[in-house]
């Protein structure tokens, strides 16, 4: 009898400081008990103070990476983060359309917290019209959700506005939308999960007061991807209830990771630094609660 772990794939850029991108995704995949694989789209010079330079990877080489992974390993679930260009968006769309990515989560990374643009302007329309329809789940934050709807859409300011935007994003074709409320200012963070079958549910967590929020979006989408891969080994289909369970588990993990790292001071220049979350909170003993 042969066995294997759930296999997950991250399509994203690098982060040499280890807090976001491919590096955060691999840590999260391991923490959530899957075997992580990668397709790297860009080499990014960044740290806890922001992005300083992006070096895009040639599209042909990205395609070669895809073939190296997908031609050899049965991927159960995939997430994409930084894609960068229209050509890369279209390449990922092609791979998703081939049915080789498993359950596919799109984290629509567009602009870094530091303000550095991570998606070319002409690629935004390709994300809206081509990438979203092949996604099983998209995980935009409030600014990203507004931009995915239209160039002049305002950010949602209320829970009801979030629900409305999540429903409107569903009209662009993804199987589900997780609209993240972390960019709000309330004491509680509310995230909205809307699925194509008409279900809408809220997830609520106390806001963790910390500067160490670097890579939270990457970590959450990777955790959801891993949870779906694990649950997919137990269920024949990822319906709304199973997806809701995966999202809930991932949000709980992120809350623990944020809380554990809330008081970390990693940077040699701490003023204005945004450190990472504690990806290993569940697997390394001795972490402060």
What spans do the regions from the language model cover?
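Conserved N-terminal subdomain of the carbohydrate kinase-like
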Residues: 2-10, 22, 27-118, 274-288
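Short glycine/threonine-rich catalytic loop with a Thr-x-Gly-x-Asp
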Residues: 16-19, 207-224
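Glycine- and other small-residue-rich loops at beta-strand/loop junctions that grip anionic moieties
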Residues: 14, 80-81, 116, 180, ...
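Acidic-glycine-rich active-site phosphate/pyrophosphate-binding loop
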Residues: 1-5, 10, 21, 187-203
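Charged C-terminal helix
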Residues: 5, 53, 235-238, 244-289
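Conserved phosphate/ATP/ADP-binding segment of small-molecule kinases
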Residues: 121-200, 228-244
């Amino acid at each position: 009898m042969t066995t294997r772990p759930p296999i997950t794939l991250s399509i994203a850029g690098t982060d040499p400081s280890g807090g976001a991108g491919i590096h955060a995704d691999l840590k999260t995949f391991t923490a959530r008990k899957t075997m992580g694989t990668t397709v790297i789209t860009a080499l990014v010079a960044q740290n806890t103070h922001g992005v300083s330079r992006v070096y895009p990877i040639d599209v042909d080489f990205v395609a070669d990476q895809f073939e190296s992974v997908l031609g050899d390993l049965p991927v159960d679930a995939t997430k994409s983060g930084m894609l960068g260009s229209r050509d890369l968006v279209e390449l990922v769309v092609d791979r998703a359309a081939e049915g080789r990515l498993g359950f596919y989560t799109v984290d629509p990374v567009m602009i870094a917290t530091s303000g550095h643009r991570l998606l070319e302007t002409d690629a935004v329309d390709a994300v809206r019209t081509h990438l979203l329809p092949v996604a099983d789940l998209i995980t935009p934050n409030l600014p990203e959700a507004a931009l995915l709807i239209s160039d002049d859409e305002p950010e949602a300011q209320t829970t009801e506005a979030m629900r409305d935007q999540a429903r409107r994003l569903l009209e662009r074709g993804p199987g589900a939308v997780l609209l993240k409320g972390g960019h709000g200012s309330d004491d509680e963070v509310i995230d909205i999960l809307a699925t194509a079958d008409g279900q809408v549910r809220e997830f609520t967590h106390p806001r963790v007061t910390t500067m160490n929020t670097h890579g939270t979006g990457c970590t959450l989408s990777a955790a959801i991807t891993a949870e779906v891969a694990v649950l997919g080994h137990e269920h024949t289909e990822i319906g709304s209830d199973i997806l809701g369970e995966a999202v809930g588990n991932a949000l709980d993990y992120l809350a623990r990771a944020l809380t554990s790292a809330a008081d970390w001071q990693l940077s040699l220049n701490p003023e204005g630094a945004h450190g990472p979350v504690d990806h290993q909170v569940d697997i390394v003993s001795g972490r402060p609660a």
